[in-house]
Amino acid sequence: LAGVEGIGVNYGMMGSDLPSPDKVVALYKANNITDVRIFHPDTNVLEALRNSGLGVVLGTLNSDLAPLASDASYAASWVHSYVQPFAGAVSFRYINAGNEVIPGESAALVLPAMKNLEAALQAAGLSVPVTTAMATSVLGTSYPPSQGTFSEAALPTVGPIVSHLASSGTPLLVNVYPYFAYSADPSSVRLDYALLSSSAAVAVTDNGVEYANMFDAILDAVYAAVEKAGGGESLELVVSETGWPSGGGGYGASVENAAAYINNLVRHVGGTPRRPGKAVETYIFAMFNENQKPEGVEQNFGMFQPDMSQVYHVDFTASSS
């Protein structure tokens, strides 16, 4: 898989005024974006992705986890509807069963859903890795990074998932948002540390390891938790979401900060202190500002407006991979 650890972008669709899927795919390609993540199967979008050359992360609806987990035939029909018809012409990177459902009432559904999807894909002769996407709220301890552990609420679910993924060599997807840590406690977190703008290692020295930015510190806390939970040092992480809002009234939400974070990120994702030299496959959140998301910063994570004009410029050719 050499050369695929590029920068992808999440294509959210919670907007009433978004461009047609074919225009969106063309916009990805025009901006040298190599990969796309979609949160649920949409056949119009999958049609537009045919022969596009884009790598695709395909999510399931969280509401589909229950039937996917309990009914192998439902998983088979899901694969038959959304993967099989496109498999030759769409480059599926991963299928992620559920987004940020651990910990919670649906958490126990994730691994059975993953296994049923894996069996359905195998029966269809398709080799697409199946994983899930977690928020960093699964961590009980995240500071310092080497002490990272999963919370007592998350560990009973996450532990078996981590072991399962490690045995198949499939990465775990994690959503990493320094913005929310910064905006919740701006007096304790330096802005340049959150924005990946610091030229000096600041704020965190962990067993002699220096962290110059929060993105690496959060990732390494998850790596430490994964290792403690039985994933060993072989299980890789993919950052399935990260972003910074350009407006919406949140503390530190500005076009200037969003542009700094995303451009610094594109240049940066070449490895963390705990996993040096290993490029981190990363998906920015998000392609567009989406007017059907909750009001405030949630509507302002896009790099583009719905009319396809830039909110701020991102140079994707600068990717460190």
UniProtKB/Swiss-Prot annotation:
GO terms for molecular function: glucan endo-1,3-beta-D-glucosidase activity. The keyword Cell wall biogenesis/degradation does not apply. Disulfide bonds: none annotated. Residues 1-6 form the signal peptide. SUPFAM superfamilies: (Trans)glycosidases. It comes from the Eukaryota. It catalyses: Hydrolysis of (1->3)-beta-D-glucosidic linkages in (1->3)-beta-D-glucans. Keywords: Glycosidase, Hydrolase, Plant defense, Signal. Its EC number is 3.2.1.39. May provide a degree of protection against microbial invasion of germinated barley grain through its ability to degrade fungal cell wall polysaccharides. This is Putative glucan endo-1,3-beta-glucosidase GVI.
